[in-house]
From Swiss-Prot:
Chemical reaction(s) catalysed: 5-amino-1-(5-phospho-D-ribosyl)imidazole-4-carboxylate + L-aspartate + ATP = (2S)-2-[5-amino-1-(5-phospho-beta-D-ribosyl)imidazole-4-carboxamido]succinate + ADP + phosphate + 2 H(+)
Species whose genome carries this gene: Corynebacterium efficiens (strain DSM 44549 / YS-314 / AJ 12310 / JCM 11189 / NBRC 100395)
Record-linked NCBIfam families: PRK13961.1, purC
Pfam families listed in its UniProt record: SAICAR_synt (PF01259)
Key word Ligase present: yes
KW Nuclease (keyword) present: no
Full protein name: Phosphoribosylaminoimidazole-succinocarboxamide synthase
A Gene Ontology molecular function term of the record: ATP binding
EC number: 6.3.2.6
Enzyme class at the top of the EC tree: ligase
UniProt-listed Gene3D superfamilies: ATP-grasp fold, B domain (3.30.470.20), Phosphorylase Kinase, domain 1 (3.30.200.20)
Pathway: Purine metabolism; IMP biosynthesis via de novo pathway; 5-amino-1-(5-phospho-D-ribosyl)imidazole-4-carboxamide from 5-amino-1-(5-phospho-D-ribosyl)imidazole-4-carboxylate: step 1/2
Amino acid sequence: MGLDSPDMRPELSQYKHLSAGKVREIYEIDEHHILMVASDRISAYDFILDTEIPDKGRVLTAMSQFFFDAIDFPNHLAGPIDDPRIPEEVLGRAMVCKKLAMMPFECVVRGYLTGSGLEEYRQTGTVCGITLPEGLVESSRLPEPIFTPATKADVGDHDINVSFDVVEERLGEARANQLRDASIAIYSRAAEIALERGVILADTKFEFGLDENGELVLGDEVLTPDSSRYWPAEGYEAGHVQPSFDKQYVRNWLTGPKSGWDKNSGVQPPALPGSVVEATRERYIEAYELISGNKFSTWIGCCV
C-alpha cells in the first residue's frame, strides 16, 4: 500500500525534525514540503509554560485553516487537513506546507491601541514611528489600521518593534511596501469577517515567505487566538482593558496576586491551576466557533 491509504499513514518519527518553536514543531516531509505541528503548549511573557491547554493545537490549526480558506491571498498550504502524509497521532493539529524562504520580520497590524503599542504611545505619541492622534486611551480604535513590524526573536527572547524604515533598509522599498500593503489588506478583510460574527480583531501578527518563484506567500499560523487579540464586540468601550478570547486570560492570572509570580523576575512562571486551564480552553474554542460558524466537535481528531 502507498501513503494514499489511510491505514498506512507515516509515523511522525519517519520525518526529520527541523525545529521547535514556542508552540509548533516543524518536520521535513521532502525537499519541497514540511509538516507543521501545533502543540498544546502555551507561552506568555516569552516563557513556555509548564502547563498545556488541552485541544489548543487543534483550535489553532482549525482557525488557521478557516482563514486560509477565507482570505484571498497565496498561502503555504500544500494539502488538505486529512492529507495522507500527516501521521495519525497529529491529525487535526498538523498541516502539510510548502517550504518558504521566510521574511525576517513579524508583520503586526493594529486596528486598536493596547498592549505594547499603548505603552509606546503613552511615552512618545507614536507606535513604531507612526504618529497617532492625541487623546487615545486603552482600547481606542485607530483611525485606520497601522503596520507595526517587529524583529523575529529566538525562543525566550523578546520581539523588538521597529519602524517601517528598518524594513525598507533590510528588504528594499518595493518588498517592504508589498509586506505592509498585504498585511493591512488581510487584517482588514479578517476584521470584517470577525465583526460580522460579533468579534473585534484588535490586532494580529502575520508571517510571510517567498516561494520558489519569488512570490510573496502567507505562512505560519494565521489569525489564531495565539497570534491575535480578539474581543467581544458587545460591550466594547474604549478606556479600559477588554475581555478577550485569547491567552490574555493566562497573562492576567500570571500577573495577578494569586500566582505569586513577578514577570520581571526571570523565573519560570508557576503551573496554571485547572480553572485557568479550562477557562482558557473554552475561550479558544469559543473564538473558533464564533468566528468560523463551525462546531469544534466536528473538527478532525476532536473528542469534545
